Amino acid sequence: MPQFILLLRDDRAAVNGSSPEELQQLMYKYQDWRRTKATGGQKLMDGEGRVLQKQNGKPSVIDGPFAEAKEVVGGFFVIEAANYDEAVEAAKTCPHMEFGTIEVRQIEKT
């Protein structure tokens, strides 16, 4: 069955406005969702990251975090679905929709 990656982009303002209790409840929702829908996934480290880009023909590294971005990739899930429509329907049920966006991309078989 095809695999899809769900890239979870956090709206930092929404996350920062949540109480510790609300965040704990959200983590429980993530755990339940992952057990039933995902074949893999991880939360990414807060405040870490590097972007590589070519400058003057050579790789250049920019350190994160990227505070100027309204949304940052905060994690990902890998799911199996028959097609994009099914993957999108699964993504709609992800608790991440409460405070962020989800990009759905099919993983190419190698």
Where are these regions (language model features)?
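Conserved, structured core segments of small domains
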Residues: M1-T110
